[in-house]
Regions:
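Donor nucleotide-sugar binding/catalytic pocket of nucleotide-sugar-dependent glycosyltransferases
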Residues: 146-210, 214
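Short acidic/histidine- and often glycine-rich active-site loop of Leloir-type glycosyltransferases
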Residues: 321-333
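Aromatic "clamp/platform" in nucleotide-sugar-dependent glycosyltransferases that forms part
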Residues: 298
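Nucleotide-activated donor-binding/catalytic signature segment of Leloir-type glycosyltransferases, i.e.
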Residues: 260-278
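Conserved acidic donor-binding segment of nucleotide-sugar-dependent glycosyltransferases
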Residues: 331-340, 348-353
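Short hydrophobic beta-strand element within catalytic cores of glycosyltransferases
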Residues: 315-318
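Conserved donor-binding/catalytic core segment of Leloir-type glycosyltransferases
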Residues: 206-226, 232-235
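Short alpha-helical donor nucleotide-sugar binding micro-motif in glycosyltransferases
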Residues: 95, 277-278, 285-290
Length: 356
């Protein structure tokens, strides 16, 4: 039996025929969890045919027994509306009798495919990996239709999940509460985060008192989901209190320049390093060299970066959103968007080392 995997992920196809994941979310490692049960995997996703688009060679999505159903490549709601008719036509013509369908949601593609399958009376499963109610919360996204997207996305996800024949959630409880399946439907919680044993520390991380501490945060700056502004404001508050820290931020995006300006306005430019996108090896090196990991997101599913930091033995501070409370002790949690609470938590942690 074959599987059709429908996802919002964006892919790039080279003239060689090889397909790569833009953000590294869909690679050979992911396919193995399906190929052990299915003969072949068909990936239905947006695909850009381009030889010049910069891509990490390690993000190879092509694999034996994996094929791709190319959907029109679009970015944002306006381009989506322009391509919606074409998307509907391709999806309708690509439905294959006898296949198992998994729709990764939230996302327009997963929702669109699920609607087609329902009309054709074809059962489907869902992988619930995020929460539009949090994604479009105040401060997370700057868009004139943010409120509309928030309510519409939440409605669509509830509708798609409740009609599913099976569901996998990346959280233990959070997403299940807001987006439940029908009582008779099988559901399970599982994470696709894989930690290589070679990356695990040989000994526990020991936090020593020092003149300046190294803080690390990871996340795209394309949107304000990861709250870089909150981290910068907390860093400035700590500096005023005589608690000196240096922040390294891994991740690129359109808000990087604005965050650099904010750091300058807060007089902490020399204390912040926006390194942009880096290799897997560089991420591991930063984790090894850091004293404290921060993930103060405004929205989350089950955060891969936080799990990796915890696996490295790093003390971590997070927010009370998504799956973060399922990973961290209550002592290490703050309200989303609260820079004062973050500064207080960091100061307490660094001046009471035994909490780590």
């Amino acid at each position: 039996m074959d599987l059709v995997f429908c996802t919002e992920a964006r892919l790039v196809r080279r003239s060689s025929g090889l397909v790569y994941s833009i953000d590294g979310g869909l690679t050979n490692n992911l396919w193995q969890r399906y190929l052990c049960k299915f003969n072949h995997v068909y990936v239905m996703a947006r695909v850009l045919s381009d030889d010049d688009c910069p891509i990490n060679d390690k993000y190879l999505a092509s694999s034996e027994r994996v094929s791709f159903i190319d959907l029109p490549y679009y970015l944002g709601p306006i381009q989506y509306l322009k391509t919606r008719r074409k998307l509907n036509k391709i999806v309708a013509n690509s439905l294959m009798p006898g296949c198992v369908y998994i729709c990764r949601v939230p996302g327009e593609i997963g929702t669109l495919v699920a609607d087609h399958l329902r009309r054709c009376k074809v059962p489907y499963g869902v992988e619930v990996v995020g929460d539009p109610w949090d994604v479009f919360a105040p401060g997370a996204v700057r868009h004139p239709f943010r409120v509309f997207f928030r309510y519409r996305g939440t409605y669509d996800l509830k509708r798609t999940v409740v009609r599913a024949a099976a569901a996998l959630y990346v959280t233990e409880n959070q997403l299940q509460k807001r987006y439940p399946v029908n009582n008779s439907v099988f559901s399970i919680s599982a994470s696709d985060v894989q930690i290589s044993s070679r990356n695990l520390p040989s000994s526990e991380k020991v936090l020593y008192k020092k003149e300046k501490y190294n803080l690390l945060s990871v996340g795209s700056l394309e949107q304000m989901y990861k709250a870089p502004d909150v981290v910068l404001e907390a860093l400035a508050l700590l500096k005023d209190r005589g608690v000196y820290c240096r922040l390294t931020w891994l991740g690129e995006g359109k808000n990087k320049g604005e965050m650099q300006k904010l750091a300058s306005a807060l007089h902490i430019t020399n204390d912040v390093n926006f390194k942009g996108n880096v290799s897997r090896e560089e991420v591991d090196e930063e984790l090894k060299n850091s004293d404290l990991f921060l993930l103060v997101s405004r929205t989350e599913g089950l955060p891969r970066a936080l799990i990796e930091a915890m696996a490295m033995g790093l003390p971590c501070i997070g927010t009370q959103v998504g799956g973060i409370p399922e990973l961290l002790n209550k002592q290490m949690l703050i309200r989303a968007g609260d820079s004062l609470a973050l500064a207080n938590k960091i100061e307490i942690l660094l001046t009471h080392i035994d909490m780590a």
